Design a protein with these regions (language model features):
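A catalytic-pocket lid/entrance helix-loop region that shapes and gates access to the active site
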Residues: 190-217, 491-499, 576-602
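C-terminal motif of bacterial Sec signal peptides marking the signal peptidase cleavage site
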Residues: 15-18
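N-terminal cap/lid segment of alpha/beta-hydrolase-fold proteins
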Residues: 288-434
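Cap/lid segment of the alpha/beta-hydrolase catalytic domain
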Residues: 383-408, 430-529, 535
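Positively charged n-region of N-terminal signal peptides that target proteins for export
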Residues: 1-5
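Acidic, low-complexity Ser/Thr/Gly/Pro-rich repeat segments typical of extracellular/periplasmic
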Residues: 21-324
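Primarily recognizes the serine-hydrolase "nucleophile elbow" in alpha/beta-hydrolase
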Residues: 540-602
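A conserved hydrophobic secondary-structure block that centers on an alpha-helix together
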Residues: 153-184, 407, 411-455
């Protein structure tokens, strides 16, 4: 997809209408005296959409670098090489918003800044979406340095805002810089011609400029409501923060629907790759455990078996390191953008509306899906597996990026994953029906589940209690390596770089996502054992019958396993719904009762 940065549109339009550069504006336009004074400042904010339209200078985070077509960042246009996925700017272009904790860096030209005035000239608000219908009804919330929300520093020609509290995910924020910020000569900092065009009350010279100008006016009005003198504002920006956990929760919701209606009802159409019906039917099942000796201390017994888990990454040698998760549904952002785009053809709009109507999705659903969890739970399953082909034969949202607007991942394969199970010996009295409380253990980077066989950890955890410990390898670790022709099988247990994947950052991100989903779905498989035990089948289940279905499941994670556990605890315990049935399903199949996280990130 070709990304369109609004900043480039603005710069190109201004260039066509006779603007010179940041030092001059041709045509002798009428300029507001306040703007005119600001433009004469020796020290100005470094924001330039005019001088070089092919390489605009923008201040991030900003709405100017958002792609309205699919709701993602368009930062790859700012990268030297937009195809180089090791560049964070390119990777950010695959996400649905800006960081919740990354510092805001604002550069200036001219003189150095006066550090004593740094905190006086910066303001940050949590707001509604200025493009939404209900924006005016949402009062802005002011974040301050005094309340510990952020700290502002000035050094040289750079103003740095350090977020000491993370911003909310999938939320709207606006920041402003005012002339209360001074340079070392004691003079007010000023705006550039680029911002002057957006701030001016004179109508934009071309239609393409109007959205940015309208947003700037709305933003300055919002700061005025919050008590900031808009005549002092020399720059504003609005930005959306990235979602956190939406994709993983969508994966959990898809699993819940698969449990309820069958896996084939969820993983179908464009939401599934080359997966056979036989493999699909194995999802969330476990083979009976077989004896594999004892722990290193000889105290407890080790068993092994297979668990069948959904896998959303590629496994082929030529794809596993370069292909991130893909969405199994068309993007809601792409759908809404097309329907609201004045330049879109009536034929395409008719096609989309006809499809939505056929699938049972209303216009009200589209309006509320971003904010109403109940509507989300309705719409996402209806779109999963679907494809929209436009009048020219092209597919709407052919990129199928994973975002909060298209969070359901495409199933690439059903993985047969080896599990390890550690149980107390017969002499303990624990080898009886419904005796053992269940825990899941997850190892760290470069390690493997074999830690349960080669260390004293399981003996320490079990001690003298009736406790069962399950473990599987992280993706690409241990028994889950990748076979490379001419090389053999490689694993992250010896080559951690294949998991971290700094060459293709989105794949590194999704390796971690897959790690979390594996634990969620292992928990589901254990929950299915619990359900069978509760139905009175313990006698026929052999070793599995010894598990206690009434004590829930705990999680123990070390290093990368602890990092996985942070997300697992959040998503596994996030309710699927409010009904009694939803709560029962969460407790039986998903919830994690206790978390023990050692050295996350170490």
């Amino acid at each position: 997809m070709k990304k369109n940065i609004l900043a480039i549109l603005i710069a190109s339009s201004i260039g066509l209408y006779g603007c010179g550069n940041e030092g001059e504006v041709t045509g002798k336009p009428t300029i507001d005296p306040i703007i005119e004074k600001s433009l004469k400042a020796e020290t100005k904010i470094k924001f330039d959409l005019i001088s070089n339209p092919s390489a605009p200078v923008v201040i991030k985070p900003t709405y100017l670098a958002m792609d309205k077509n699919d709701g993602t960042l368009a930062t790859e246009k700012l990268a030297k090489d937009p195809t180089k996925w090791s560049d964070p700017l390119v990777t950010m272009g695959k996400t649905d918003g800006w960081s919740t904790n990354q510092p805001i860096i604002i550069d200036f030209t001219g003189n150095d800044l006066d550090s004593a005035t740094a905190a006086d000239g910066f303001y940050l608000l949590e707001t509604g979406d200025p493009t939404s219908k209900d924006y005016a009804s949402i009062p802005p919330k002011r974040l301050t340095q005094a309340n510990g929300d952020f700290k502002v520093f000035a050094s040289g020609k750079t103003l740095t805002v350090l977020l000491t509290k993370p911003l909310k995910p999938a939320s709207q924020y606006q920041f402003a810089v005012t002339s209360d910020l001074k340079d070392i000569k004691g003079n007010e900092v000023g705006m550039t011609n680029s911002y002057a065009v957006l701030k001016s009350t004179t109508k934009a010279p071309v239609k393409e400029l109007e959205p940015a100008q309208d947003l700037t006016h709305a933003s300055e009005a919002t700061f005025a409501v919050a008590g900031i003198d808009k005549n002092k504002i020399i720059f504003t920006s609005w930005f959306t923060t990235a979602s956190a956990g939406d994709v993983l929760f969508a994966g959990k919701a898809a699993t819940a629907l698969a449990l309820k209606n069958g896996a084939a009802s969820v993983w179908q159409g464009s939401a599934i790759g080359d997966v056979s019906a036989t493999d699909l039917a194995k999802l969330y099942t476990m083979t009976p455990p077989t004896s594999a000796g004892n722990t290193v201390g000889g105290t407890n017994e080790v068993y092994t078996g297979k668990v069948y888990l959904p896998y959303f990454l590629e496994t082929a040698a030529d794809k596993f390191s370069t292909t991130p998760w893909q969405s199994g549904m068309p993007s809601l952002a792409a759908i809404k953008n097309l329907l609201g785009d004045e330049t879109a053809s009536s034929a395409d709009k008719a096609i989309v509306m006809q499809k939505l109507t056929t699938w049972g999705i209303t216009q009200d659903d589209l309006e509320n899906v971003g904010s109403d969890p109940a509507v989300q739970l309705k719409v996402l399953p209806l779109l999963t597996g679907k494809t929209i082909t436009l009048s020219d034969g092209n597919q709407l949202d052919s990129d199928r990026l994973i975002t909060r607007y298209s969070p359901v991942p495409k199933l690439k394969s059903v993985q047969e994953v080896e599990y390890t199970l550690v149980l107390p010996p017969a002499a303990s009295g624990c080898q009886a029906n419904e005796k053992n409380t269940v825990s899941i253990y997850q190892h760290g980077i470069t390690a493997s589940k074999e830690e349960l066989k080669t260390s004293s950890l399981p003996d320490t955890i079990i001690d003298s209690t009736c406790n069962a410990i399950f473990a599987i390898d992280l993706p690409l670790h241990g028994t889950r390596g990748v076979t490379i022709p001419g090389v053999g099988t490689i694993t992250a247990s010896t080559k951690p770089e294949i998991f971290l994947n700094l060459e293709t950052l989105p794949v590194g991100r999704d390796n971690l996502r897959q790690s979390v989903m594996d634990q969620i779905n292992l928990r589901v498989a254990i929950g299915r054992l619990f359900a069978s035990i509760k139905q009175g089948n313990a006698d026929a289940m052999g070793t599995f019958g010894w598990l206690n279905p009434d004590k829930g499941v705990s999680y123990i994670g070390h290093s990368l396993g602890a990092m996985t556990g942070v997300a697992l605890g959040n998503v596994a315990n996030r309710p699927l719904g409010t009904s009694a049935a939803d709560q029962q399903n969460d407790a039986l199949f998903f919830n994690i009762n206790k978390l023990a996280l050692a050295n996350p990130g170490a």
